[in-house]
Amino acid sequence: MGFPADMPSPERNNLRILAFLVIALVAAVSAFLAVYILDGDGGGGAEAQTVREYNLEIVATDIDYGGGNVWHAWTYKEVGAEKGTVPGPTLEVTVGEKLKVNVTNKLDKAHSFHTHFSNYDIESDGSQINIITQKGAGAMIPPGESWTYEFEPTHPGILYYHCHSADGGNTISQHIHQGLYGGIVVKDPSEPPVRDEVIFMSEIGFDTEGDQIPPYIMNGMGLPGGERALEDAYAAGGFDAVASQFNKTVPVITAKVGEEMHVHVVNIGDLIHSFHAHNVDHISLGTLRGDTWAGNLLPMVPGQADTLQFTFTKPGPWLFHCHVVAHADAGMIGLFNIVEDTGTATQPP
């Protein structure tokens, strides 16, 4: 005996139950991300599709570099998190899934969420086009309002999001450099899982206080004086003085010897930067499709992004920095902390 045409089959009911359980489970864990299954049309057309839904807020966040040096940044924040970050939360999605991003603007200027995806509806553009066409005008989010942006990624790799507003007498560039940017990692469903790390290179925003503010930053951090400042800290207080700067002014990424990482590097700034890490081959999975960058140096024009496959073969702290050396001297430095594979690596304080 068949089912009436208007009655879902047991299989479709099970799919809905599974989707409900997944939503309930993820919602209990995090208000930031929900993953669920969207039914097909039931008529043999569209198939069921996984939806990855993120919830973000745009908020003010003070980034304290110590010694009275503070950046009053604008940031994207995970709903439920204590404060925002620069860069904003990294969003992950797999080719074939739908990405939904719900954004609430909690600042006193209009802001938006613009990506470099393709093949999306104009209502998800998050630019001035939404205002002048009045199609999805709310995508340029007024203070206190929210908007949902939807995308369907077609190929894997690194993309990013940023504010596209020029509200409040500030330029689009100023909105971005004030901290409103973040990464989107699009995964290949046919590839095995791999560790992802995202590094943004940029100039710092305009709203700062203190006389030791880094002009150039990586992942929101910078140490004026660069590597020489690390030498001076060691001379003054030993390694503890150096370690006190870890993930405060100097970004540190800990990994194991032999561990493969995909390091996604983005130049979100208006200047030419370059990226170099010590003692590792810079295999380009994006721009060069698997070839190694000559000189193990990734050149980066403004807006450029690439994915580097890194596998360190020797333990130790290994520097990474902008190889426009004046930028490194001004603070654009970081460390890969590579440890022997004797247990789980932990991030330094």
Set out the residue ranges of the language-model regions:
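Extracytoplasmic low-complexity repetitive segments enriched in small/polar residues
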Residues: 87-89, 97, 196, 200-205, ...
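Short proline/glycine-enriched turn/loop motifs at strand-loop junctions of beta-rich domains
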Residues: 106-108, 268-271
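N-terminal, post-signal-peptide metal-ligating segments of extracellular/periplasmic oxidoreductases
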Residues: 36-123, 127-128, 133-146, 179, ...
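Extracellular/periplasmic metallocenter environments
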Residues: 107-111, 118-121, 129-192, 298-349
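Secretory targeting signatures
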Residues: 1-48
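Hydrophobic beta-strand segments within beta-rich accessory/binding domains
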Residues: 101-103, 163, 263-265, 275, ...
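Intrinsic, low-complexity N-terminal interaction/targeting segments
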Residues: 170-171, 274-276, 282-298
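A short beta-turn/strand-edge loop motif at beta-sheet boundaries
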Residues: 112, 273-274
